[in-house]
Amino acid sequence: MNDDQPDRFLKLDEVKRRVGLGKSMIYRLIQEGKFPAPYKVTPLASRWSDQEVRAWIDDVKDGFEGKKRTI
């Protein structure tokens, strides 16, 4: 993502779709400091930074680069 573009906020369903993880796993990773925490935009609503989620995806892909699955 270009740094000149404004950041968007994502709902949990969009975050789950993008990263392929469920709600429980996302919140477990947040507690472990391994996934970006959401921002409280209202007392009842949390949203994730699109840029932070994209950066996490890139970090995960970089961590597995060169490692192929064996069957």
For the regions a language model picked out, list residue spans one by one.
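Short, solvent-exposed alpha-helical "recognition" segments
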Residues: 32-39
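Polyanion-binding surface elements
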Residues: 1-25, 32, 51-52, 58-62
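Short Lys/Arg-enriched helix C-cap and helix-to-coil transition segments
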Residues: 39-45
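Short secondary-structure boundary/hinge segments and terminal tails
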Residues: 34, 47-48
